[in-house]
Structure formats: C-alpha cells, structure tokens
Amino acid sequence: MSNENKTIHDFELKLICDFFSNMERQGPGSPDVTLKALSFIDNLTDKSLIADIGCGTGGQTMVLAGHVPGQITGIDLFPGFIDIFNRNARQLGLQDRVKGIVGSMDNLPFQNEELDLIWSEGAIYNIGFERGLNEWRRYLKPGGYIAVSESSWFTDERPAEINDFWMDAYSEMDTLPNQVAKLYKAGYLPVATFILPENCWTEHYFASKVAAQEIFRKKYAGNKIAEEFSSLQMIEDELYGKYKEFYGYTFFIAKKIEQ
C-alpha cells in the first residue's frame, strides 16, 4: 500500500498516541472557538454534569472548565492521553471537578438522561457523525445540549484529489445542509452552526504538529512505519492549503428535543 493511499487508521494506536500526545489539541480548534460554541449553551449550573467525549489530552476541556461550573468527565480511548489530561487538571487546580477516564465512545459509562452537556471537538468521526448523534442522545437530560465539531464539505462538487483523500479517511463526511438534517433526524434542535476559521488549522493545529513531528521523528528514528505516519501528517497539511475552500470543520450546537 503506498503512503498516498494510507489513512491514520492504518497505523498502530501507540504510534498515533505518541505523536498526538505532544500537542495541546489533537485536531483543529482554538480556545476562542471553544468559548464561542459555549456561548450558545445556557443550561449550566454548579450541579451540571458534562462529558467531553474523545477528549484527547484535554486542551479544550481545560478551557471549558475555566468558564463553566459543574463536573466535567473527559473520556478517551488512549491511556496516555488521559494521563496528560489528569496531570493538566491537577496543575490547574481543577482535579476536584474535572477528571479523565479511559473509555470508548461507543460504550459510555453514563446513565440515561444523566448529562446536561455532551462536548466533542474533532472526535465524533471515530464513531461516525450520525451514529454518535443517535447513540449519545439518550445520555442527555431533556433539554440538554450537544456541541460537536465535525469535518464538512462546503460544496457539492470538489476536485478528485481532495475528494478521494477524504473518502478514504472518512467516507461519512457530508455537506453542511445534510449534517444539519441529521441533527433534526436524531432528535435535536440546531441552535447554532459555524465554520471554524482558518487559524484553527494553521496556528492551533498544523503549527503545533510541526513541533510534535520533530519530537516523534527523533524518538522513532529509523522506524519506517513511524516515518510513513509522520509523512501522512504532512500530506494532510498540504491538502488543506490547496483545497481549504472546499472543506473544513464546523461546530454544531444543538438541544435535545422530545420526538
């Protein structure tokens, strides 16, 4: 299999974790965008229960914790990410109400109608946008909120190179109108949608990825598989520079409604 045809899913979880653990965020985003999404949510008190699903090392979670009351549980499949998450919470003095646990987003450790807010930045694709919306809904209280960022097509047609790349990486990627329709279908009332600005990719994701690559390549010097993985990250960056008018990330904020 050529490197051009590989996706992140073709590599060992340990390699993926080692690479991205050196980054504050494991996908496009920024503190400003996190807070913008949060501004559309009005149901939170010091009794609120919040879950950040696919939290990574918790960059966005710590931003949330600094601006909302309540208890926050971060969930991620990678123990290495959760170790960093909990260390960051302790360093910020948030450990009494912010904790990270190892778990899978397709088997969440919550009761039905337990959560006031489900948050997930750049992670719902791991289970699929539509599946995540449907399966996670039951954990929300009536009137609870979901806030997720997800990759979106901005046009119905796009060049074959970028279309083929994303069809290999994430075939469920869809256009904005279709994604909003999926929110309705899953039992949510869309409250706000907005496209993440370019600096969420260039300054807050790609720039930190360069530093992470240097650490990663030194650690895995001579490891061909690790070198292939590192090269794939560069391909993603280059494609965004060429085709950013055709796709990006969108934040979706929605409220659970009775069906």
Task: State where each predicted segment sits.
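Conserved Class I S-adenosyl-L-methionine
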Residues: 192-259
